[in-house]
């Protein structure tokens, strides 16, 4: 349970993500003692929690992960932005988010839905939130496995999971 999956640090705030897998719902509790220590030692530190989802069956597409569905079909679904999670309630993992100054780049995929991205947009009013997706990934989860900043003007992007051309403009302009 890497911290980067569960908690997001933006400025002086630590945000607990919703987590979208039922088996990972309680992971945030492991970090609470450390977060409490930071909170007690720094009067400017903010500790926030996104709304914890219920993670009912309505949050997931039935049989989406069936072994009967081949990779080609999954690639088509990824290109169409049709994922295992529905839009029932906000869902996101912190590991689907990269921060570039005032820009938050959020991967829409298996663990982060559009309602989760909207929640982040509303929560971080002083930041620009950008949704991205990587059509070449049949199981899109956690942005740093696909896309990693190295320095201004340079990113590493997995060649099998390319950022669509229309989404590259943000990075080319900056």
Mark where each language-model region is.
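The feature marks the mature, well-folded catalytic cores of soluble enzymes
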Residues: 1-174
């Amino acid at each position: 349970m890497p911290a980067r999956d569960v908690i997001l640090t933006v400025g002086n705030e630590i945000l607990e993500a919703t987590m979208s897998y039922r088996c990972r719902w309680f992971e945030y509790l492991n970090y609470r003692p450390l977060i409490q220590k930071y909170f007690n030692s720094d009067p400017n530190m903010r500790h926030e929690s996104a709304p914890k989802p219920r993670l009912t069956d309505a949050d997931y597409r039935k049989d989406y992960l069936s072994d009967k569905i081949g990779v080609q079909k999954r690639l088509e679904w990824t290109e169409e932005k049709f994922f295992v999670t529905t839009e029932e309630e906000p869902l996101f993992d912190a590991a689907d988010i990269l921060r570039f100054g005032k820009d938050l780049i959020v991967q829409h995929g298996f663990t982060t839905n559009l309602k989760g991205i909207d929640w982040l947009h509303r929560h971080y009013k002083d930041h620009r939130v950008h949704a991205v997706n990587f059509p070449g990934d049949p199981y899109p989860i956690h942005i740093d496995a696909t896309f990693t900043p190295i320095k201004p003007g340079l990113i590493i992007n997995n060649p099998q999971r390319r950022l669509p051309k229309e989404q590259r403009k943000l990075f080319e302009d900056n």
